[in-house]
């Protein structure tokens, strides 16, 4: 039996992850082991990622992560983000973030009251390098100057770019686009683009590249230009949040953090302390992350069933307030669960 280490974290992480676990347990048999992490954990134990949680994560085959609240800058000395620590610790170098409106973009635009959404059907996958870039956390103060090191390695670039091409081919995608700022960041992004241009020659699939600033505009104006995007850590973080607006917001944005030996699944959204405890957080991103989990373990039909259930809820406006509905977090989880149960019974 596969072991899943569940780390709910802070805020709405504690509300959406239980809904995801309901779906996980309905569709498979897993041993659930729970760990703690985040700001509450820091206040309780003096450590945002206790050793006990690390050991449980090591023991598990898969990690399911909620969301964490970070302390304010300067509030905690030498603070290290638990999620970034886990990504580095387990070499989870590929962050896969699907941006998909299930072919019902116009409907989502109406129910979510996003006026700029139209009938365009969005199906983009952003693949973000997950262990390098500015997120290595090498920052320092020299007198009155703050300095951050941006680390881009050939090994890290090759690894994520090959992953993107392999992902595209395996999933019958049509194109891989490299997003960079090599015209200014000539050494760091220059290396990333150089590696992309070397590797693309070995794959029989369309490949191109765009500057990150023009990409930010074209994601909104011409999202149909993009299929699979591969990019560096910070650009991927920013662009995927921006792109989520095309599909109704972060409440519909799942993600997978994949390494050679382990994977971690999490919603893209944060802990949302402004709505925590109100029971109105959208659990769909967490539940869609479970769909990605089933894809990862080779049970794509279960992942597809989850996505079908989410689409059903969107079409029938069985959604939380962020998407224009009036259901509670638990209600949406129950609606998705009931749809899955009916389908499994042949209804």
Curated annotation (Swiss-Prot):
Q: Which reaction(s) are listed as its catalytic activity?
A: (2R,3S)-homoisocitrate + NAD(+) = 2-oxoadipate + CO2 + NADH; (2R,3S)-iso(homo)2citrate + NAD(+) = 2-oxoheptanedioate + CO2 + NADH; (2R,3S)-iso(homo)3citrate + NAD(+) = 2-oxosuberate + CO2 + NADH
Identify the residues that bind Mg(2+). Answer: 213, 237, 241
Q: Where is the PTM Phosphoserine found along the chain? A: 81
List ligand-binding residues for (2R,3S)-homoisocitrate. Answer: 70, 87, 97, 128, 135, 181, 183
**Any single GO BP term:** coenzyme B biosynthetic process
The record's note on activity versus temperature states:
Stable at 100 degrees Celsius for 10 min.
UniProt-listed Enzyme Commission number(s): 1.1.1.87, 1.1.1.-
Going by the UniProt record, its keywords in alphabetical order are: Magnesium, Metal-binding, NAD, Oxidoreductase, Phosphoprotein
Q: How is the cofactor bound?
A: Binds 1 Mg(2+) ion per subunit.
Q: Which PANTHER family match?
A: DECARBOXYLATING DEHYDROGENASES-ISOCITRATE, ISOPROPYLMALATE, TARTRATE (PTHR11835), ISOCITRATE DEHYDROGENASE [NAD] SUBUNIT ALPHA, MITOCHONDRIAL (PTHR11835:SF34)
The record's function comment reads:
Catalyzes the NAD-dependent oxidation and decarboxylation of (2R,3S)-homoisocitrate, (2R,3S)-homo(2)-isocitrate and (2R,3S)-homo(3)-isocitrate, into 2-oxoadipate, 2-oxopimelate (2-oxoheptanedioate), and 2-oxosuberate, respectively. All these substrates are intermediates in the biosynthesis of biotin and of 7-mercaptoheptanoate, a moiety of coenzyme B in methanoarchaea. Is also able to produce 2-oxoazelate from (2R,3S)-homo(4)-isocitrate in vitro, but this substrate is probably not physiologically relevant.
Q: Which protein is depicted?
A: Homoisocitrate dehydrogenase
């Amino acid at each position: 039996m596969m072991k899943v280490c569940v780390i709910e974290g802070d805020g709405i992480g504690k509300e959406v992850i239980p809904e995801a676990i309901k779906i996980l347990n309905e569709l498979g048999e897993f041993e659930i082991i729970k760990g703690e992490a985040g700001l509450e954990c820091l206040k309780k134990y003096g450590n945002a990622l206790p050793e006990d949680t690390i050991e449980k994560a090591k023991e598990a085959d898969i990690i399911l992560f909620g969301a964490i609240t970070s302390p304010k800058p300067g509030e905690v000395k030498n603070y290290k983000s638990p999620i970034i620590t886990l990504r580095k610790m387990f070499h989870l170098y590929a962050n896969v973030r699907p941006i998909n409106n299930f072919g019902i973009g116009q409907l989502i635009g109406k129910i979510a009251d996003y006026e700029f959404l139209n009938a365009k059907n969005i199906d983009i996958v952003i693949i973000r390098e997950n262990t390098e870039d500015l997120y290595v956390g090498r920052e320092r103060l020299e007198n009155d100057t703050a300095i951050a090191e941006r680390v881009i390695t050939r090994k890290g670039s090759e690894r994520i770019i090959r992953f993107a091409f392999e992902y595209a081919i395996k999933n019958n995608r049509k194109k891989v686009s490299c997003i960079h700022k090599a015209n200014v960041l000539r050494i760091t992004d220059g290396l990333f683009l150089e590696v992309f241009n070397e590797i693309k020659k070995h794959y029989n699939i369309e490949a191109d590249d765009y500057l990150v600033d023009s990409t930010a505009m074209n994601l909104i104006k011409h999202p149909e230009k993009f299929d699979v995007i591969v990019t560096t850590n910070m650009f991927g973080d920013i662009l995927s949040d921006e792109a989520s607006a095309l599909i109704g917001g972060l409440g519909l944005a799942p993600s997978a953090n994949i390494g050679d030996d382990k994977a971690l699944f999490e919603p893209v959204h944060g802990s949302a302390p402004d709505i925590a405890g109100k029971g109105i957080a959208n659990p769909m991103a967490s539940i869609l992350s479970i769909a990605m989990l089933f894809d990862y373990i080779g049970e794509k039909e279960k992942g597809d069933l989850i996505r079908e259930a989410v689409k059903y809820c969107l079409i029938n406006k069985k959604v939380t307030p962020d998407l224009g509905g009036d259901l509670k977090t638990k209600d949406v989880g129950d609606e998705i669960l009931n749809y899955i149960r009916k389908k499994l019974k042949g209804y």
